[in-house]
UniProtKB/Swiss-Prot annotation:
Keyword Transcription regulation: no
Highest taxon of source: Viruses
Organismal lineage: Viruses, Riboviria, Orthornavirae, Kitrinoviricota, Tolucaviricetes
Name assigned to this protein: Double gene block protein 1
Positions of region (Disordered): 15-45
Organism listed in the record: Carnation mottle virus (isolate China/Shanghai) (CarMV)
UniProt keyword annotations, A-Z: RNA-binding, Transport, Viral movement protein
Assembly and oligomerization: Homodimer.
UniProt keyword Transport present: yes
Amino acid sequence: MDIEPEVPVVEKQMLAGNRGKQKTRRSVAKDAIRKPASDSTNGGNWVNVADKIEVHIHFNF
């Protein structure tokens, strides 16, 4: 039985009009979740190898 973790999806919301600068800084681990080579028994398990995933969004109005 494969174990599939829940991965949050972050979507950038668009503002109506252009009300100043929008600064977005994203610090996301590239390989936060990787699937190792398949195992003959269960097809491999998902392994979370990232300590934390951070997304910082700052708006200046």
